[in-house]
A protein has these predicted regions:
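Residue-level marker of alpha-helix boundaries and capping positions
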Residues: 50, 130-131, 216, 248
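Rossmann-like NAD(P)H-binding beta-loop-alpha module
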Residues: 207-249
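Gly/Ser/Thr-rich beta-alpha loop segments that engage phosphate groups in nucleotides
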Residues: 53-58, 81-82, 88, 183, ...
Length: 297
């Protein structure tokens, strides 16, 4: 009997697509259909691609478009980080946060909003899930099957220089492309694991707006999340070990962003050292030394 790659998978195995509402159900039907049967390998593949994120999908589609015989292997979600826990959901939140900022700035144009801004965070997140599900068809298993690609769902194991095994099936190939990407790093910060934390893989599953949010790391993703949640109304602390936010960018440009984020209410703690997380009766505290000042927040 052929082994189904997803025979042991359930929605609970994917915390990045919770809650399992109609939109996330539609997403999963596209990027990880639970009823999918892996095809029988046919002959020798010109290219086996391991990982169906942005790089893997482009490689697979490009090779197939040139007439190559392609196998595409993905053990989690087609579309990878960009579709599921990166570019798409973050930009949906950024757009909602920008709308908040526009309403708050409306007075300078003579537009009065007497009742101020009211944030419906569950509706913001539902919109994100709806948009993500709509886009997911472009990265779907069945779309790439329609391109003539053999799509396998499961974990790949290289057993020889020209052989990969997946759920009892043997695939022979001339070339292989490993495009498996990365996972969030669990930082060795005292108290972090005990207190619990979010990553880019789980933050987009929130259904309630956090009253307080600490963001560790002020690169592009950290800044996006910090500013968005601050505009939604969370009390946000952004911690960066380097001398300023966006440490890999031009300092003048980063300084402009820094000023705007402070205007949005983000508390910046740069040159952060001796970071510690403490779970106390009144909630989770972040203790950090920033520019020689000790903060307990």
């Amino acid at each position: 009997m052929p082994i189904q790659a997803n025979s042991l998978k359930t929605p609970d195995d994917f915390p990045q697509v919770q809650p399992y509402d109609e939109y996330n159900q539609n997403l999963m039907e596209n990027v990880h259909p639970f009823d999918w049967d892996n095809p029988e390998p046919e002959g020798r593949y010109n290219m086996v691609v391991v990982g169906a994120g942005t790089a893997g999908l482009v490689t697979a589609a490009g090779t197939a478009g040139l007439g190559g015989k392609v196998a595409l292997i993905e053990r989690e979600l087609m579309g990878g980080d960009c579709l599921n826990v990166g570019c798409v959901p973050s930009k949906a939140l950024i757009r909602a946060a920008r709308a908040v900022a526009h309403v708050k700035e409306a007075g300078q144009f003579g537009v009065r909003v007497p009742d101020g801004v009211s944030i419906d965070f569950p509706a913001i997140m539902e919109r994100m899930r709806r948009l993500r599900a709509g886009i997911s068809k472009h990265d779907s298993v069945r779309r790439f099957q329609g391109l003539g690609i053999d799509v396998f769902q499961g974990s790949a194991e290289f057993t020889a220089a020209d052989t990969v095994e997946i759920d009892g099936k043997t695939l022979k190939f001339a070339r292989a492309c490993i495009a498996t990407g990365t996972r969030p790093l669990e930082l060795p910060i005292p108290g972090l694991a005990e207190a619990g934390y979010l990553t880019n893989e789980t933050v987009f599953s929130l259904t309630e707006l956090p009253r307080r949010l600490g963001v560790i790391g002020a690169g592009p993703i950290g800044c996006e999340l910090a500013q968005s949640f601050a505009r939604f109304g969370s009390d946000v602390i952004l911690i960066e070990s380097m001398h300023g936010i966006l440490p890999n960018e031009d300092r003048r440009a980063a300084g402009i962003v820094e000023n705007i984020m402070e205007q949005d209410g983000v508390k910046l703690r740069c040159c952060g050292k001796n970071l510690e997380v403490r779970k106390q009766n009144d909630g989770i505290h972040l203790v950090v030394d920033s520019h020689g000042t000790n903060y307990d927040e």
